[in-house]
Amino acid sequence: YKIGEPVFCEKDVHIQFYPQEHIYLYDGQEQFIPVSSVISCFFKPFDSYYWSEYKANQRNISQGQILEEWDSKGACSRDVGTFMHQQIENYYKGLPYQQEFSFKYDGKYVHIEEQISLELEYMQFIEFLENHKFKPFRTEWAIYDDELKIAGTIDMIHKRGDVFDIYDWKRSHRIVDFWGKPIAVNNYGEKGLGELNQIEDTPYWHYCIQQNLYRYILERNYDIIIEKMYLVVFCDDTNEYRKLEVPRMDEAVSYTHLRAHETLSDL
């Protein structure tokens, strides 16, 4: 299933993505806002100061240690996720696929140096390939909307006749439950802001909105019709990958589109 030469699109030359910094540059100069940052504007931010103080008092340790513990977990999750995406891209390019990641964190309170195995995730990816024997149209495709000045990266897109399907790789314990169903309800009753106030504040719904915004960008700027969108979850707490079809969320896309200029000006 190795992908051949990338299908060239005249828009590709204008956008550059730097994954470590998570920065998109338009024509090497103007910075575009990642779609994930756009979505976060429509949900209440986590009050890390309040909750770290609460947890520190509970455990009788410093607030700084709590914040570092959270920061190290977040850094590990992001770094391993980025690494997994790179390895999947290597597979499609015919390059060696590594199954172990070296994570280091050296803070004031937290010091971590460990090897993290992605053997289970790799096996799940191979199982996905066995069940989806098609050649991708594009992988790791940076796309953008130059009017809204937003950009994002599609993990894999498949051409099926005259339409396309989007696939998004995820490595997370917070998207599906033990039975493989999406975690679609926030346990604390928290929801989105404004007209998104009926959408539960969970990673699952954040990713669903993200895929719908990718669909919007592609259909508006690339003359591509998106038929299906999927989240594909690889995780070390199960032997099987999980494939979730993403629902169309036209109202959410319309609202985020209309509010984008106003909201992003505050970033």
Predicted regions and their residues:
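Charged, glycine-rich intrinsically disordered N-terminal tails and low-complexity linkers that flank
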Residues: 1-83
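Catalytic cores of nuclease domains that cleave nucleic-acid phosphodiester backbones
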Residues: 4-6, 72-73, 77-196
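Active-site catalytic microenvironments for nucleophilic, acid-base chemistry
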Residues: 90, 94, 217-221, 263-266
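Metal-dependent nuclease catalytic cores in nucleic-acid-processing enzymes
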Residues: 199-230
